[in-house]
Regions:
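PLP-dependent amino-acid enzyme catalytic core
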Residues: 1-421
């Protein structure tokens, strides 16, 4: 009879050892109340500010803990990782601190800002190799490098020592408050943070409900739990790049399947709203994955009322060049941004008529593409409009139809819409 391998769970002693190991490397990040959200939800909302961590994310914890356990021979041969973001920065800094040579594979679309950050943290101890168009391409090249040169691969999440390092976030939270924590919201990507945190809370705060939060466009953990087996997704929306993975780690899946009270998904547009709200109201800058746990609160308004709630803010490595897209997605989610094909009569004054008679006093044209064609009665234009209120949409469409300007509504046509957003 074939024996089933027991599920690995991080031992409390191993996580405590990781915490000692990380002293002087990772900082003990604040656990602080967010006044605005506490008032909004009628709850005590606490942020665990891993966005203030060294390398601006929790990833240094797992990377350094894993690499510090390498043998002298493994350190001498060097390490390899594949990443387009926070894991690469954590590995790079760990290479410098431990004096280990590292090779970091990054896909070609990686923003130059992130490449420069990795260079800054790793200095002379790392080499960066740009390989392939996707993370999977970079990952395959990194694994081949390990096989041919006998180097150690530092996995971003599917590794015991990495999980134990990330679990130290949980130890800190429970040390920083004496209040009973009713809800813990934790972002889920590959599952390193969620598997580590959930194990610590199951051991030390078993009554806490642990909610894993994934982006709607990359529900790899939720899909796997529903299927009762680790399942790779065919495709994902890469927008929430710090949490968009096609397949979670095998170790991480087994732990999270047992430990998480619930896994939910949050629309990318809601995540963008949260990013903007945090910046405008609290001057907090987060990356999309860093906003996941906070974005989930709107889906638990009744459950968390009067409760003590912790949201893990996982990182702040946001690329400033993405600001326009974040604003656009937030407006679309709020039903305030709309795209149309508008039929303009080929005569003088048609545009003025559209602006004066069709648009409302608070409607704003944000996008306009039009080419006049003299051999046609009507010319089609692609028009983007920003509304003051979502209630203004139906009257706007009625005015367009009544005056023969309406051609088509593009927001619900994904094949066309993807070229605009």
């Amino acid at each position: 009879m074939m024996q089933t391998k027991p599920i690995y769970f991080p031992a409390l002693e191993s996580v405590q050892a990781a915490a000692k190991n990380l002293k002087g490397v990772a900082i003990k990040t604040p656990l602080s109340q967010n006044t605005n959200l506490s008032k909004q939800f009628g709850a005590n909302i606490l942020f665990k500010r891993e966005d203030l961590q060294v390398v601006r994310s929790y990833k240094i914890r797992g990377a350094y803990n894993k690499m510090s356990f390498l043998s002298d021979d493994e350190k001498q041969r060097g390490i390899v990782c594949a990443s387009a973001g926070n894991h690469a920065q954590g590995v790079a800094l760990s290479c410098k601190l431990l004096a280990i040579k590292g090779t970091i594979f990054m896909p070609s679309p990686t923003p130059n800002q992130k490449i420069e950050q990795v260079k800054m943290f790793g200095e002379a101890f790392i080499d960066i190799v740009i390989e392939g168009d996707t993370f999977d391409d970079a990952f395959a090249a990194a694994k081949q490098e390990c096989d041919t040169k006998k180097k150690t691969f530092i996995h971003p999440f599917n590794d015991e020592k990495v999980i134990e390092g990330q679990a130290t976030v949980g130890l800190e939270i429970l040390e920083q408050t004496k209040e009973k924590i009713d809800y813990l919201f934790v972002p889920v990507g590959g599952g390193g943070l969620s598997s580590g945190l959930s194990t610590i809370f199951k051991k030390l705060s078993p009554e806490t409900k642990i909610i894993g939060v994934e982006p709607e466009g990359a529900p790899s953990m939720l899909t796997s739990i529903n299927n009762k087996k680790n399942t790779a997704l065919d495709k994902i929306d890469p927008f929430v790049d710090g949490a968009a993975v096609k397949k979670v780690g095998d170790l991480n899946f087994e732990i999270c399947q047992k430990n998480l009270s619930q896994v939910i998904t949050v629309p990318e547009g809601k995540i963008c709203q949260t990013i903007l709200d945090l910046y405008n109201k609290d001057a907090i800058v987060v990356e999309p994955a860093g906003a996941l746990s906070i974005a989930a609160l709107d889906f638990f308004t009744d459950e968390i009322k009067g409760k003590n709630v912790v949201c893990v803010v996982s990182g702040s490595n946001n690329d400033i060049t993405r600001t326009a897209e974040i604003k656009e997605r937030a407006l679309l989610f709020a039903n305030l941004k709309h795209y149309f094909i508008v039929k303009f009569p080929q005569r003088a004054g048609a545009l003025k008529e559209f602006v004066v008679d069709i648009l409302g006093p608070n409607d704003d044209i944000t996008h306009f593409e039009y080419t006049k064609k003299n051999n046609r009665t009507n010319g089609a234009a692609v028009v983007g409009l920003q509304l003051k209120s979502s209630k203004d949409l139906a009257p706007l469409i009625n005015r367009m139809k009544d005056n023969n300007f309406f051609g088509d509504y593009l927001n619900d046509k994904p094949d066309l819409f993807q070229f605009l957003v």
